[in-house]
Amino acid sequence: MKIQVKNKQNNSKMCFICGMENEYGLKASFFELEDDHLAGTFKPCKFHQGYPGRLHGGIASAILDEAMGRSILIEDENVWGVTIELNVKYKKPVPLNEEIMVICNLTNVGSRLFEAEGKIMLPNGEAAVIATGKYIKLSLKKITEEEFIDDQWFKVEHMDDPKEFNVPEKASR
């Protein structure tokens, strides 16, 4: 199912997941979709390896945590999710050197907490890693310094950014 992108989220300079200047990071990009899912793309390489040719499980967990924590930005761009619980199930290995998609959505939103679920999807449409998480809502200003927001939190748009995502039916539920 093709779902249109409605907004690209910001990146930072040095975050391991989304940092554009972190030479060992994933340099992931995240997109808000019209159906209120959050999709992300990344291409793991040799620096992200666990077993030969496979993404390290801790890094798979980290990108799911990042994506689920960001999913609240769809509802409120001034709120960030700080992890209080993360559950991850590994189903299939995630290959290196291929464009990989992560997709997540909010499952419960309260006044102080929210919950989300996410999946790392293989190029063939299968879910490789699935996760659920619980997060506390905090303003970015409470998490970091004002200088970070001004100097290191920015939107990076590219000509080849996707305008839509082909989300497998299994991923959107």
Name what the model sees in each region.
Residues 67-101, 107:
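Hydrophobic beta-strand-centered segment that forms part of the acyl-chain substrate-binding groove
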Residues 64:
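Conserved active-site segments centered on acidic
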Residues 1-7, 95-96, 107-173:
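HotDog/MaoC-like acyl-thioester-processing domains
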Residues 40, 84-86, 102, 116, ...:
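Hydrophobic residues positioned within well-ordered beta-strands of beta-sheet architectures
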Residues 11-12, 24-26, 36-38, 80-86, ...:
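A generic structural signal for short beta-strands and their flanking turns/coil linkers
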Residues 58:
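Active-site region of the double-stranded beta-helix
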Residues 13, 17-55, 170-172:
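Catalytic strand-loop segment that frames the active site of acyl-thioester-processing enzymes
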